[in-house]
């Protein structure tokens, strides 16, 4: 603990700049027009404003807490904690997979490097770094990469607009809106109030809710902040001021520029996820600009992957190794185990990334919302409501996950199944938790949390 808020703010911004932030928001721009990047931005930001009061409340109620599963263990018991542990690891694995897939697509699109090589080598690099440096290494490395990403964005966007011409982009978008024969035909492409874009924005809230609230990396950064005031300042600056402009720009500039030229999936692009690298390669050729863009995506993937792996270290060390493998483990033994598990998790991710060659980053992200949104209601309720019982928590998670998956696979309309599936995954558990708690006779004593002492050192 005791890391300054300025460092945490930079770290939050960079660790939330995923390959999906750059390439997925560009894909959203292709799909939903000028509203795509905007809806990506606000949808993915809202969960941080759920996380901030949650962590502030947790610091007050449970001062010695270092992982969210420690809280779950004390609040709901060991059984429910194991379930949340699985979800927490699942989020980490998914996010790492998304980074590997994105980096692999960029290296392949820009330089013709085999997808498998471009995806695996960066994962190997960040694994070795985090295994040696841990969380503090992750945060200070984030600061360096914060400046690299910012500089590349500031330089590249004006050059792209100058190369393509604002008038040409606008005229191309008008054709997208008015010409049914256009490969990207979308009557709402020039509307900020696009219905499809707004549905995607709501879906983005659901997707990010699970990714943020179940990602131990964000808890680790928040807990490492010097004070509650610094925490609030760091997360507001890191998300609203520093992060939100990036997907708005990527969706508007990369995504809309591509569709304005009549280029789309199957019509110049093998995948819609290639929109961002396509436009950069068009403008820069294979020169310095292309190298800059690859560097930016590489940095985004590295920092996000680093944050995930540091979170995996914390979860496995505090909530698995110490409890179930070696209860008498020293701090040194726990750290050694944490380094080993970093390599194991990364190895599994590398295999999955290779198998996902050719998949859309945006659709991967949307589907992940169904998987990880279900536990968030019981997590939030557990922080504030004493009448939410372990049985209610588990039942809500099972129902939310089942309803979301059923909707996604049963609804035949692919333009709406992802939206309904995500909403059900979030709202069904919320309704069950609220109604169940109202009629529950269970009561939890929150005073127990203040006396909690972890089995590992808290500095």
Language-model features and meaning:
Residues 38-131, 203-208, 299-307, 338:
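Helix-loop-helix module between adjacent transmembrane segments
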Residues 27-42, 100-116, 136-145, 332-338, ...:
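Transmembrane helix-loop boundary segments of multi-pass membrane transporters
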Residues 1-64, 206-207, 218-265, 281-304:
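Membrane-interface helix-loop-helix modules in multi-pass membrane proteins
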Residues 322-323, 414-459:
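Terminal cytosolic tails of multi-pass membrane transporters
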Residues 92-100, 104, 110-121, 125-131, ...:
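Hydrophobic alpha-helical segments and their helix-loop junctions in multi-pass secondary transporters
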Residues 75-82, 93, 314-357:
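Loop-to-transmembrane helix boundary motifs in multi-pass membrane proteins
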Residues 86-98, 148-162, 198-213, 228-261, ...:
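Selective recognition of specific alpha-helical transmembrane segments in multi-pass small-molecule
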Residues 63-73, 134-144, 214-247, 265-268, ...:
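Hydrophobic, small-residue-rich membrane helices and short re-entrant helix-turn-helix hairpins
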